[in-house]
Amino acid sequence: MSRKILGILGVAAAALLLATPVQAQKSKDTLRIVINDMFGAIDPYNFPHDEAGSFYRTIYSNLLDFDEYHQKFVPSLAKSWKRVSNTVLEFDLRDDITFHNGNKFDADDVVETLNWLRDEKTKIRFKDRYDWTIPEKLGPHKIRITAKQPFSTDMSNLAYRFKILDGETMKSLSNMGDYGRTNPVATGPYKVVDFDANRGLVLEAVANHWDKTPYSRAPAKRVHGVPVPDRQTQVAKFLAGEIDLLRNVEPETAKELGGMGAVVNPTPAQNLLYVTLDAAGRSKNKIMTDERVRKAFIMAIPRDQIVKTFVPGGDTAEQPPGICFKRTVACKPDVGLYPYNPAEAKKLLIEAGYPNGVDLVLDVFAPSRQIAEAIAGEIRKVGFRTTVNPMTLGVYVKRRGDGEFTAFVGYYPTAAQPDMANLLDFFFGADRDYWKDQMIHDIAAKGNLEFDVEKRGQLYVPALNQINQKAYIYPVSELPLLFVSSKDVKVLNNPLSAAESRLGDYAWSDYKEVRPSK
C-alpha cells in the first residue's frame, strides 16, 4: 500500500466510527458501490467490460441461463426450448414480460437483436461470438435460431452472451451506440433511472418483476454506482461513510480497513490473470520469438510467492495449470507449466544470445499494475531490464489489437462463459492472437463441431499442452474479487454463477437469502 493511502487510513480512522451516512442511506434503501473505471455505456455489446458486466448482467436478460451449481440450463425470457438438429434450436417465449419502458416483449425483440448482431455493418468487439445466428419468427412468442454451421457451444453462448434488447427502441435510434448511453432499456430485475459520466449510475429494483425465482433477486431498492477512479479518494470516501462497498481492493488496503471494523470479503471470480508473450513477433521488439527467452521469463517468476503476497484473496486463489480453471468446461491440460528456476532462466537468456540481459517493456491494464511491478522485480533478477507501462482500458485494447505489445499483463473474466471454446476464441481470435499457431486454430475449429463435452475436452488437450510447452501464455492466478464493505452490507454468492459477482449479490446485512432448488 502507498504511504499516501496509509496516511489517509491513519487520519480518517475516526471517521469510520463517527460516520452516520451509511446508516442514513440504508434507511433510504440506497446501496452505494464504487466504480473503479467508469464505463461509457450500459451495453453488453458496445462496452463488454468486466466491471460494467456486474451491472448490465442484472439489467438485461437472456433467453435462458445456466445454473452452474446444478449444471443445467434454466428458463428466462424463454420458458422452454428444443434442439431440432445440430444447427437448429427453437424457443417458446414468455408472454407476460414488459421492458423497463413499458413495451411488451415478444419474438420481434429477439429477431431484431440477433439480426443487428449479425449485420455486417454492426461493428462491435468480439463480433464472432454473435454472428453465427440466423433468427426466424415462428409466432408472436416463438422463434427459431439456425446456426450457419454446427456449433457445439450454441446453447452456452445464448445463455451467457446474448442479452435481448427492446426492438422498438432499437428502431428509433440512428446510432445503436446510443442504446446503452441514452436508452438502456431491458427486462432485468434492476432498471436504469440515471446515467452520467460524473454522477455515475443509479438503478432501481423493478416492482413486481416477472421473474420470481431466486435467480433474479434485487436485494436493495436502489443501487448507486459512484465513479471514483483514484484508490486514495475511494478509501477516504468509504471511511467518511460516502461509499458502502469497495470492489477489487488491494490486499494490504483491505487488511488495514478490516482492522478498523470494515467487512472484508474475498469472492471467487475465475478472473484469469495472465502474461502474454509475443511469440509471433508482432511488436517491434522481437525477443519473445525465441522460445528460450519466453521460458526464461516464465521460470524467473515465483508464482506462489507473488500470488499470496499481491493477489487479493491470494491465499485461496486458484493457480491454474493452464489458461483455464478446474470449473472451466472441457479444460484438461496434461502438460504443466515451467517451474520457478531463476538459475535456469539466466542460463536460457545466455543461450539465446543475451549474456548481458535484455530490455523489455511490460505493458499492463492499470488495475493489475501492482502485480506487474512484482513480476518485473523478479524477472529483473535474471536479466530482463524491465519497465512497467500501465494504461487505461481503451488504450490497452487498441494497442493490443495493433500488435504493439512484447509482453503484457491482463486479466480475463472466464466466468462470463466458463468454457474452453470461449477461452481459445479469446486468446487466439481476431486481433488478440500473438502466436499464429495453426495447430491451435485447427483444434479450436474441430472443437466447435463436437457436441460431446468429454470428446471435446480430449480434442483440446494438444492445444492446451502446446500453449504450456511453447511458453505462449503464463497463467499467473485466479484474480478473486476482494470486496470491502460497511457492517451494514454483505456480498452473497451468485445463484447462477459459481465464480461471478453481479449487482443482485450486494445486499444489506439483514437480507434473507433464498437459494434455487434442484
Can you describe what each PLM-predicted range is?
Residues V34-S85, N115, V185:
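N-terminal lobe/hinge region of extracytoplasmic solute-binding protein
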Residues D67-E68, K72, A159-A218, R222-H224, ...:
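Gly/Pro-rich hinge or "lid" segments in bacterial periplasmic/extracellular proteins
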Residues Q25-K26, K82, F126-M170, D194-D196:
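Surface-exposed binding/hinge segments that line
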Residues R32, D106-N115, P140-T146, G188-P189, ...:
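Alpha-helical secondary-structure segments
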Residues D37-G53, S76-L77, N103, D154-K163, ...:
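A structural "hinge/loop" feature
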Residues Y190, K284, D315-E351, Q370:
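Structural transition elements
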Residues F39, D196-G200, A205, L273, ...:
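Detector for C-terminal structural segments
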Residues L117, I134-K137, V193-E204, V226-K284, ...:
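Extracellular/periplasmic solute-recognition and catalytic clefts
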